[in-house]
């Protein structure tokens, strides 16, 4: 018995030297022994090294673009709006730096009470229709390769009323991410027409404002960050259905609207409105010259109809301006996927060249300005102009060039069709 005890005492872990009695388990193999404590320590070391290697590989292969690179990418697709591009570039860069810091902290389990916690900063965009708000957000998502969803605030209602729940916004993001929850939790959600959900009145009412203040209240939690329960099929929730849990803490929300009438609120606050001999007179030219949205303060937005809690969750404000004629002409011609290049490509498939006179492009821009549709209305104008030609061209093998001049845009004449024989003569005389 004594010999057996001595032999048990002689069995020791080959790594830490502890005897069999000092550990829970001692595993033997090939003349060596290892205890359960050393096995656990080895597992921790291996896991830490694997996580470190994975994080390093991700950083090397998936570097976050710098603000200057983000802005340069936006320049390729979006004309003008330099101030908005700068603000958005910095905001998006800081947001995804924060996301990566949170992921790194979670992976390495280094959450410390002394470590500074970075709060999420969502974005509010102010600007007229057709100025590029939606396109800026779409282009950002394409650059960052993250899921992107667009929601219309006017279709939302408070939970329990006819209309869409705010959770349906998150469902759209999940669908854009092919129901990959981890990927969706790093996405971007663009909520348009948010000015339409302003409070109907500052005065309390006996009727509930389910599509105004009620929607703002419902949006608060998902803007700030919460774990939302999403019905996979959409629609209203009911107790006997499965839900997908989605954490909105790292989802970037870009909330936008035209905010028509906000400029009057800002001007009143700045003291530009008054009565009597001391009142300051302003002309339309003065109003056009000054971008009053740049001077917007939270108190102006509250007076417009947004609740203070909602404004507080949108600390970054970017303003976009109306596009003038020169900017709209650039929108037509300069971006990689400009409308002129797209239609030229369509005509090229029928072996026909499409040409625009400079005056024709200016006339198209003027029409968009007159209609008040901005860049968004350019495609409709181009369609109206080119559909009759695109109808005839496939049946006309003799046409070499379609030339658009100002008179054609104004509807004073048909677009000019140049035949192959005429083109050959022009080239000979040239």
UniProtKB/Swiss-Prot annotation:
- Disulfide bonds listed in the record: none
Positions binding ATP in this chain are: 128-135
GO biological process per UniProt: cell division; proteolysis involved in protein catabolic process
UniProt-recorded Gene Ontology molecular function terms: ATP binding; ATP hydrolysis activity; ATP-dependent protein folding chaperone; protein dimerization activity; unfolded protein binding; zinc ion binding
* Residues binding Zn(2+), per UniProt: 13, 16, 35, 38
Question: Which segments does the entry list as coiled coil?
Answer: none
Task: State the NCBIfam families in the record.
Answer: clpX (TIGR00382), PRK05342.1 (NF003745)
InterPro entries found in the cross-reference section: AAA+_ATPase (IPR003593), ATP-dep_Clp_protease_ClpX (IPR050052), ATPase_AAA_core (IPR003959), Clp_ATPase_C (IPR019489), Clp_protease_ATP-bd_su_ClpX (IPR004487), ClpX_bact (IPR046425), P-loop_NTPase (IPR027417), Znf_CppX_C4 (IPR010603)
Family per similarity comment: Belongs to the ClpX chaperone family.
What function does this protein fulfil? ATP-dependent specificity component of the Clp protease. It directs the protease to specific substrates. Can perform chaperone functions in the absence of ClpP.
- Residues annotated as domain ClpX-type ZB: 1-54
Entry keywords, A to Z: ATP-binding, Chaperone, Metal-binding, Nucleotide-binding, Zinc
Protein's name according to its UniProt entry: ATP-dependent Clp protease ATP-binding subunit ClpX
PANTHER family recorded = ATP-DEPENDENT CLP PROTEASE ATP-BINDING SUBUNIT CLPX-LIKE, MITOCHONDRIAL, ATP-DEPENDENT CLP PROTEASE ATP-BINDING SUBUNIT CLPX-LIKE, MITOCHONDRIAL-RELATED
Which species does the entry assign this protein to? Corynebacterium diphtheriae (strain ATCC 700971 / NCTC 13129 / Biotype gravis)
Summary of subunit composition and partner proteins: Component of the ClpX-ClpP complex. Forms a hexameric ring that, in the presence of ATP, binds to fourteen ClpP subunits assembled into a disk-like structure with a central cavity, resembling the structure of eukaryotic proteasomes.
Classification lineage: Bacteria, Bacillati, Actinomycetota, Actinomycetes, Mycobacteriales
* Gene Ontology CC entries for this record: HslUV protease complex
